Curated annotation (Swiss-Prot):
It is found in: Endoplasmic reticulum membrane; Cell projection, Dendrite. This is Very long chain fatty acid elongase 5. The gene is ELOVL5. It is a multi-pass membrane protein. Catalyzes the first and rate-limiting reaction of the four reactions that constitute the long-chain fatty acids elongation cycle. This endoplasmic reticulum-bound enzymatic process allows the addition of 2 carbons to the chain of long- and very long-chain fatty acids (VLCFAs) per cycle. Condensing enzyme that acts specifically toward polyunsaturated acyl-CoA with the higher activity toward C18:3(n-6) acyl-CoA. It is linked to Spinocerebellar ataxia 38: A form of spinocerebellar ataxia, a clinically and genetically heterogeneous group of cerebellar disorders. Patients show progressive incoordination of gait and often poor coordination of hands, speech and eye movements, due to degeneration of the cerebellum with variable involvement of the brainstem and spinal cord. SCA38 is an autosomal dominant form characterized by adult-onset of slowly progressive gait ataxia accompanied by nystagmus. Brain MRI shows cerebellar atrophy.
Length: 299
């Protein structure tokens, strides 16, 4: 295993250049194998979990879901606030920011982004709860792709570009996750569900963050600095893939629901019209419709 890890490190160095020494020795960052193994285990559970649960009763998980979602809400809020203050203190340039230009503020950003990387491992539990509750319809290609890819991408980010221009997408995503996990936490309480109206807008917010991230990343391409261009091109490509998948999800989830509701409304309207026609042709008593019969003349 050590030989394989050494070969892998040599390959990564040849492809991406030397690693950032500031994260040397940090938990899970020294070699890629633990992150890769966690991802493989995740995909195996996604595949085998629903099969295991097929003939079993779903678990409620209500109590642990409240705690889990509250924990991720607080962690996301912490990361968002720390990233905003770190960027402000380091006087980060919106258009392009290198990885070694802000001193201690860079280290603050690196520490927070390690938590962001680690949170992607914690978020595997999203899928496991879907499996335990037998909500298999929520385990979509988008869901699995997003969860599995983010952990791996951020291992590479933390080892090569752990600060600088990398902050923007993580900052926006942390803010969106404050809204998202607070929604999930509240929706775990049945009495709160009628008051939760903003799920649709969370998806819109996610799409907006991808667009804003592409714009901000493109600034680094147009007005380059010491931040490696290859990472910027990769991020733009990845954001485009997420926009495509999230847009498809949004159309499938909300536009089709709206079309279905309009169809049901039209059907009800047509049924109402037919009832009126049938009431006439089947000679219903006019008294049933609150219409007084006219007296017949006797001439």
């Amino acid at each position: 295993m050590e030989h394989f890890d050494a070969s892998l490190s040599t390959y990564f160095k040849a492809l991406l250049g030397p690693r950032d020494t500031r994260v040397k020795g940090w938990f899970l960052l020294d070699n890629y194998i633990p992150t890769f193994i966690c991802s493989v285990i995740y995909l195996l559970i996604v595949w085998l979990g629903p099969k295991y649960m097929r003939n079993k009763q779903p678990f409620s998980c209500r109590g642990i879901l409240v705690v889990y979602n509250l924990g991720l809400t607080l962690l996301s809020l912490y990361m968002f606030c720390e990233l905003v203050t770190g960027v402000w203190e380091g006087k980060y340039n919106f258009f392009c920011q290198g990885t070694r230009t802000a001193g201690e503020s860079d280290m603050k950003i690196i520490r927070v982004l390690w938590w962001y990387y680690f949170s992607k491992l914690i978020e595997f539990m999203d899928t496991f709860f879907f499996i335990l509750r037998k909500n298999n319809h929520q385990i979509t290609v988008l869901h699995v792709y997003h969860h599995a890819s983010m952990l791996n991408i951020w291992w590479f980010v933390m080892n090569w570009v752990p600060c600088g221009h990398s902050y923007f997408g993580a900052t926006l995503n942390s803010f969106i996750h404050v809204l998202m996990y607070s929604y999930y936490g509240l929706s775990s309480v049945p009495s709160m569900r009628p008051y939760l109206w903003w799920k649709k807008y969370i998806t819109q917010g996610q799409l907006l963050q991808f667009v804003l991230t592409i714009i901000q990343t493109s600034c680094g391409v147009i007005w380059p600095c010491t931040f490696p261009l290859g990472w910027l091109y990769f991020q733009i490509g990845y954001m485009i893939s997420l926009i495509a998948l999230f847009t498809n999800f949004y159309i499938q989830t909300y536009n089709k629901k709206g079309a279905s509701r309009r169809k049901d409304h039209l059907k009800d309207h047509q049924n109402g019209s037919m009832a009126a026609v049938n009431g006439h042709t089947n000679s219903f008593s006019p008294l049933e419709n609150n219409v007084k019969p006219r007296k017949l003349r006797k001439d």
